[in-house]
Swiss-Prot record:
EC number of this enzyme: 4.2.1.33
One GO term (biological process): L-leucine biosynthetic process
Quaternary structure annotation from Swiss-Prot or TrEMBL: Heterodimer of LeuC and LeuD.
General function of this protein: Catalyzes the isomerization between 2-isopropylmalate and 3-isopropylmalate, via the formation of 2-isopropylmaleate.
UniProt KW Transport keyword: no
Gene: leuD
Domain of life: Bacteria
Family affiliation: Belongs to the LeuD family. LeuD type 1 subfamily.
Organism: Histophilus somni (strain 2336)
Keyword S-adenosyl-L-methionine: no
Catalytic activity: (2R,3S)-3-isopropylmalate = (2S)-2-isopropylmalate
One example GO MF annotation: 3-isopropylmalate dehydratase activity
Cited PANTHER family: 3-ISOPROPYLMALATE DEHYDRATASE SMALL SUBUNIT, 3-ISOPROPYLMALATE DEHYDRATASE SMALL SUBUNIT 2-RELATED-RELATED
Name of this chain's protein: 3-isopropylmalate dehydratase small subunit
GO cellular component, one term: 3-isopropylmalate dehydratase complex
Amino acid sequence: MAGIKQHSGLVVPLDAANVDTDAIIPKQFLQAITRVGFGKHLFHEWRYLDEEGTVPNPKFVLNFPEYQGATILLARKNLGCGSSREHAPWALADYGFKVMIAPSFADIFYNNSLNNHMLPIRLNEEEVEEIFQWVWKNKGCEIHVNLENLTVTTGNKIYHFELDEFRRHCLLNGLDNIGLTLQHEDKIAEYEKNIPAFLR
């Protein structure tokens, strides 16, 4: 898994608060247990006019031509509230999002996103409003995120965010739970060699 040190990407402004996980990925698409294939169902009930997902809703922001290929999602407070389904970050990641910016995230969704190698950035509401205004005035613009310096840059404006140092280390080095464990592979092997036979 590749580390994330910096990311520049097209930002899409989802002007909605309290976007729950059922809106992100509706329950009828939760049968699969692998992480791929959910992107086509992302925001299904907002993104499409039919149940089959063949008629795009031209009024939904993800369908606007200027936001095709977006990798940064900008939203309002309490993003990812509702049920704790891990399919929500799977769908966002499979669609192509690498970074999310909002004033706040539901706790479980926030942690699930980090576990799935996406970066959820918390800025205060005034800063998020500034970014919304900037994006609306500069359609098709890119935002630059620097995980090493913990900064978000829009044009000439720089915003600073906080992230737990352990989480930052994992993202910078492309480490998931398995990768973290394998960092101590030699110690694990040494421990297993010294386990008494009757405990093996």
